[in-house]
Each structure stands twice: as C-alpha cells, then as structure tokens.
Regions:
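Rieske [2Fe-2S] iron-sulfur-binding domain
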Residues: 2-11, 15, 20-24, 34-161, ...
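Short, isolated positions within intrinsically disordered regulatory regions of eukaryotic proteins
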Residues: 33-36, 101, 142, 202-204, ...
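C-terminal catalytic domain of Rieske-type non-heme iron oxygenases
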Residues: 65, 148-371
C-alpha cells in the first residue's frame, strides 16, 4: 500500500493551531531544539543562530546561565547581536535600549525624560527558555504570542551508562524541509545504496529483515534486537566482548532519533536531531558517547563520511524536489515515515482541540523489508 507524501505533509501543516504563517511552515512549536554548540559561545561573547525561521542571539550571563533572545530589538528591529552585552543586560546598538538577557525585559531607555510616563518594565524583547546540555545550547521554541506553560520539561539529555566515556559532536546541513530530513533519517532501506562500504555493508549483502516496533509517548521504538548481520562494526563488537549485541532505536517528536547499543559492559549511545532552520534548510545535529576502546578521532573519520553520504543524497534529492514531483510512501519500509506524519498531525490536532493525542500505532507491530 502506498500513500502520497505531499498529502501527509499537508495534513501535518493544516492541523497547526497557530498563525497562518506558522502553519504554512510545517514546523512543530513548543519543543526543545539544539540551536548551536556550546563551544560557539565564549565568555561574554554573543552568538547567533536560526531555529524555525526565528533569528536568535545567544550567550551566557556572568554567572554562567545560558540565554536566548529573538535577535531583533522591539523598538526598530535592528539585530540585538550588534549591541553590547555586559554579562547581565544586552544593549541595542541603535538607541541604547537595554534588556535583561534571561527574561528579555527592558530595563532602560536612554531617550526618556522625567516627563515621560512610559512603563519601561512592560516592554519585552522576544525571549526563549534556554539550557546547556550535552554540549549544546537548547532553546524551547514556544509558538508566537503564546504564554509559556508553568512547567517545562528539561531539555533532552543523551543517555550514558558509565561515569567515564568518550563523546563527540558532528553536524551537517541538508537543503530540504525538516520533514524530508526526518523521514530520511529513519528510512531503513537506503543503507546498502547510500552507505555501502567495506566497513559498513555492501550492496550484495541485502537480505530480508524483520523488526518489531512499539508505540512510546510522542514516538515509536524499534524494540531491542540483534543488529544487522551485514554490518561489520556489530560483528566486531560481538567478537570482542563474546556477549550478544543488542540495539534499541527510538524516535520521538519533534525530531529526535536515539540509538543505544549494548554488549556486556560496553555500550554506545547516540542522538541525532533534524533541526529545522528554514523551510528549505535543516541540520543534522549528532552526538555520540561510548566506553568502547575506540578513539574519538577514528570514530569521527567514519561518522563524518556516513553523514556526508546522507548530505550528498539529500542535495541530489533537492534537485528533484524543485519540480514538486508526486511522491509516495510504501509498506513496510516506509511505515516509520507514515507514523511520523501521523504523530505530527495528531499532536497538532490535540493542541488545536485540547483533546488527548491519539497515537497512530494501536500497539506493537512487526515490519518486514529488505536492506
């Protein structure tokens, strides 16, 4: 059974409860997104980023607290990132308006006189909750004009299984809408063609696979299983430990794929997010940690090539998508993509109606495909 991709994408956008501009983007608001690496912010310096087509200025206060503000002065629109930051307040370079970095509240307008009755404290620059975690500045992107909930869950944290481990971060941009990036990330059938190599898998190694999936809150899980026998790293790990190798893969809204691999006392944990930048641009932010005897430099060589292969494929796909072709999703290999669109549409619908979200999976299911 096949379904048009366009209709699934449109269903997700049409259900959005916010402004027309927001619904047209197909983005999911009121979630945490990684804006940039922690290393990009130094001392009292400022850094800029864009999430969901919102320009941001980010930094740390003198006491080390991360903050994120809309990079636009509410007075005349000049980017606040051109201003001066003293560790507590951010001063606009145009008229000297000052804003408290962690709240966005205006604290000074130099042009006001004793005759003016303007209540400065009622003016706010755009501000978003911000946390540092796993080497990223995470920003909670609440929808335009909406009030923040009284409590917000903490930003996502990479799962680790020992006190000592190695960790590394990688990123690459994809010239596509975030939906295309996400369904590409979860696609199980492209490996032997896009990622074929002597150390991963070869084209002739394609064989039928059976995987069990189960629903989880806001997502789905590929249940713990023995990983692909046609992938050399897994075979090497089992040979080294003498223990079975199991892997568990989760996807949760809005854009997070995690994978945990265990074999005896050894483990590998990774998270990939497809971060929406603009309607035509997204970014894979990848972080991995492990206690294997694998140097970071060696892992990065292979991981960079792996991500570059995905990036090159998405660049080629973007050429075809310029002409708005009719696309389709098939069973069973594309079923995870269908679940993603179902999750997205149902989450947006629950926001609009106030009703509980209906999960597109009624229960555990077994899928079959060849890869």
């Amino acid at each position: 059974m096949s379904e048009p991709v366009q209709s699934l994408m449109q269903a997700g956008a049409a259900a959005a409860p916010e402004t027309v501009a927001e619904s047209d983007t197909g983005f999911l608001w009121d979630f945490w997104y990684p804006a940039l690496r922690s290393t990009e912010v130094r001392g009292n310096g400022l850094a800029t980023a864009m999430l969901l087509e919102v320009p941001l200025v980010l930094g740390r206060t003198s006491d080390g607290k991360a903050f994120a503000m809309r990079d636009s002065c509410p007075h005349r629109g000049i980017p606040l990132s051109y201003g001066r930051f003293d560790g507590k307040t951010l001063e606009c370079s145009y008229h000297g308006w000052k804003f408290e970095a962690c709240t966005g509240q205006c604290v000074e307008i130099p042009s006001l006189t004793s005759q003016d009755k303007l209540k400065v404290e009622r003016i706010f620059a755009g501000h978003y909750p911000c946390e540092e975690r796993d080497g990223y500045f995470w920003v909670y992107m609440n929808s335009h004009g909406s009030r923040l909930p009284e409590t917000i869950a903490a930003a996502p944290k990479l799962t680790t299984f020992s006190e000592k481990y190695r960790i590394t971060h990688l990123a690459c941009e994809l010239p596509s809408h975030v939906d295309q990036g996400i369904i590409g990330l979860m696609d199980p059938a492209h490996g032997p063609f896009v990622h074929q190599s002597w150390y991963w898998r070869r084209r002739h190694s394609i064989h039928e696979k059976e995987k069990k999936f189960e629903p989880i809150p806001n997502g789905f899980r590929m249940s713990p299983h023995t990983p692909s026998s046609n992938s050399a790293p897994y075979r090497m790990l089992q040979k080294y430990t003498g223990e079975p190798v199991t892997t568990t893969i989760d996807f949760v809204l809005p854009n997070i794929r995690t994978e945990e691999i265990r074999s005896g006392k050894l483990w590998f944990s990774s998270r990939a997010t497809v971060t929406p930048v603009r309607r035509d641009l997204c970014r894979i932010d990848f972080v991995a940690a492990w206690n294997l005897l694998l140097p970071v430099t060696i892992f990065r060589i292979f991981a960079k090539k792996f991500l570059r292969q995905d990036q090159e494929t998405m660049i080629l796909q973007a050429e075809g998508l310029k002409h708005n072709p009719r696309l389709m999703l098939i069973d069973d290999a594309d079923r995870p993509a269908k679940w993603y669109f179902g999750l997205k549409a149902n989450w947006l619908d629950s926001r609009r109606t106030g009703a509980a979200m209906v999960h597109p999976m009624s229960g555990p299911v077994t899928l079959h495909w060849r890869s």
